[in-house]
Amino acid sequence: MNQQQFVTALAEQGLEVSDHQLQQFRKYYELLVEWNEKMNLTAITDEEGVYLKHFYDSITAAFYFDFTKVETVCDVGAGAGFPSLPIKIMFPHLKVTIIDSLNKRIGFLNMLATELGLEGVAFHHGRAEEFGKNKQFREHFDVVTARAVARMSVLAEYCLPLARVGGQFVALKAAKLGEELEEGATALKVLGGNLRESFQFQLPGEESERNIVIVDKKRLTPGKYPRKAGTPAKDPLG
């Protein structure tokens, strides 16, 4: 997917990319490739791959969830900024908080935000389980996002404690979602979430299945969750 195909594909979904936004994506790509030589940010470094499998793929969440109606977003395990920073570029009003367990990536994200002129972004080093217990972050965000971080049964315990009641958890997943949703049903219920809907589609020009899962936060998460760091992955709820 080249730049023009990227713009056209988003326009087909009702999303217009301005010249300024296109420049931001271009700079994002250049910095990602440059810094990837210093640290492991992504296995995908060719321009068409980055535009399709990182930028476009991140923004697909906005095809099924209306980011114009929310203000605060927390992205768990964003790595090199996906999905939240491409979403932030497209929806500049958003206040984005990223939590990532690797401090080197936080350094990259701080530099990236400065270079792209992104305002209303904050980057925090640590584990989602720790932030889910922190009163400053717990049940604070309109939307919590995550892309390819863990299976739903684990991901729910990372993300739902951070979403406010009335907010949403939006997960960007790859193939074979049905089994994950079955496994994760108990976790969603225990943690105060209700599955609203899931959407399956393919990336343009590829037979790569993708899924967007939207979970409504209906009830407060019980105080004992999230459990201590590492426990959700070792012993998923359900």
Curated annotation (Swiss-Prot):
The keyword Ligase does not apply. Coiled coil: none annotated. The keyword DNA damage does not apply. It holds the Pfam family GidB. It is found in: Cytoplasm. SUPFAM superfamilies: S-adenosyl-L-methionine-dependent methyltransferases. InterPro entries: rRNA_ssu_MeTfrase_G (IPR003682), SAM-dependent_MTases_sf (IPR029063). S-adenosyl-L-methionine binds at residues 77, 82, 128-129, 147. GO terms for cellular component: cytosol. Its EC number is 2.1.1.-. GO terms for molecular function: rRNA (guanine-N7-)-methyltransferase activity. Transmembrane segments: none annotated. Keywords: Cytoplasm, Methyltransferase, rRNA processing, S-adenosyl-L-methionine, Transferase. Its main location: cytoplasm. Specifically methylates the N7 position of guanine in position 535 of 16S rRNA. Belongs to the methyltransferase superfamily. RNA methyltransferase RsmG family. This is Ribosomal RNA small subunit methyltransferase G. The gene is rsmG.
